[in-house]
Structures are given as C-alpha cells and as structure tokens.
Amino acid sequence: MTEKLQRILSDSKGARWTALFIVAFTMMTGYFITDVMSPLEVLLDKPIADGGLGWTSDDYGFFAGSYGLINVFLLMLFFGGIILDKMGIRFTGIMACGLMVIGVFIKYYGVTGDFGGSRFTLSFVNFSLPMSAAVASLGFAIFGVGCEICGITVSKIITKWFTGHELALAMGIQVALARLGTAGAMMGALPFAKAFGGKVGAPVLLGLVLLVIGFLSFIVYTVMDKKLDKSVEEAKGEKEFEKEKETLDEESDDDFHFRDLKYIFSNPGFWCIC
C-alpha cells in the first residue's frame, strides 16, 4: 500500500506546490481587479471634459457595492457551491474564471466607452446613474460572481492536494498571495493611471491582461488535476478510489441533493450562524 500511495501525484512536493501557486496566482489577479478602482476615485470625480468619468460619490458607492449584488440577491454563492459539488473542480473553475474575464471586459468598456452623457434611470424608484457607471457596475457584478465561486473552488483544490500534507501552510500562502494582489491594486493603480495620462481604463486593462493570464494558468492546472485523479485511481484501484472521492477527487461522495435544503433551513444552528 505504501508503494501505491507514493505514486499519487499529490505526494510529490513539487507537484502540489506548483498546483498551489498556479491557482493562487489566478486568485491574486482576481483580488487585484476587485480593488483596482478603489484608488481611482480622484479621477472618477473629474468632469468628462477633464478626462474623468463625472461620477459622484453616490455613483462610485453603487459601483463598489455592485460586486455583491448578484451574489446576495440571486444567491449565486449558494448555487456556486452546488455547482462545485455536482460538476467538479475543473468545470467550476473554468466557468468562474470565464465569468471573471467577461465581467472585466464589460467593466473596461464601461470606463472607456463614449456614452455621450447618457444616463441609466429607473424612474419608479428615482434612481439614476451615468451610463458608464451602470455598465461598469454590471461588469463588476458578473466579475464578483466568478471571483467568489473561484475562491471556494480554490479552497477545495487546496484541500484536495494538501490533505495529509501542509494544508494550513498552503491555505495561508494562498491568502497571502491574494492580499498581495490587493496591495498591488491599492499602491499601483493610481500611479499607473497617471503614467498613461490619467486614464481610468489603463489599470483596469492591466488587470484584464493579468486575469487572462490567470485564466490560462487555471487551464494548465486542470491538466494537473486530471493527472492527479488518474494517479489516485491507479494507486488505489477503482474500489478504493471511490472511497477517497470526498477529499481526493472533484466528485464528492456526499453529493448535494436539493432535498437536503429542507434539513439545512430547518436547522436552528444554520440561522444562528447566519
């Protein structure tokens, strides 16, 4: 049995740390995009004629809050967890990264497009936004769905590769690299924008390029993930492989069923935690 276990790919220190840094880099680019607009408010407030976007503080506040709109009101994190359990790491990760890239494309169009001073208005609630803010908010909301689902996917990936190894250290390094993305956005976004003539879109475009690289990196990871599954299957045999799915495979033995919702919502502990 020891000889078989040594053939599992996650037992290779180089392989599991490579897998970690690949997915951690993807999350780092996501965190960079999340906060890249935060230091740019001084440019957003400028009139359009002066190279800004003409946003007010209220406009920026709505944009910043849009990150969680779809996640909260459409319960996308909840459904994202279900998708992860049902469809597995590779499918969910690629889907999440794809949503992030699409969202940032829309966000970039929102802050660089010429909307001619048009506004998005909902008269029945007396709500109005510059069209640039509305489009950017839509993109940021879509990005937020992908980023949060990617986060829970990365957590499952780390558990899959590092169970029985340096699990806590791996999680700590992943969080540290993610915060490095936040620090890069906070410290570098405004100087980068000023280097390109005060254009708000410049750091967003930089983030988009980094995110695409992160997406491609995750695709590379899926190859490693498939090899890990194959190595586990070969080492354990088909019968034992089925028993290890919960921690070493993307398909958990404890698959989610919609009937489980009854037990979740009827559990007082669930509502206390909420």
Predicted segments with their positions:
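Juxtamembrane intracellular "pre-TM" segments in multi-pass secondary transporters
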Residues: 2-13, 230-273
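Extracytoplasmic
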Residues: 18-49, 57
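Central cavity-lining transmembrane alpha-helices of secondary-active solute carriers
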Residues: 65-82
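C-terminal ends and interior cores of transmembrane alpha-helices
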Residues: 98-128
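Cytoplasmic helix-loop-helix junction between adjacent transmembrane helices
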Residues: 133, 139-177
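Glycine-rich segments within core transmembrane alpha-helices of 12-TM secondary carriers
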Residues: 168-194
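Symmetry-related core transmembrane helices of the 12-TM Major Facilitator Superfamily/SLC fold
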Residues: 201-222
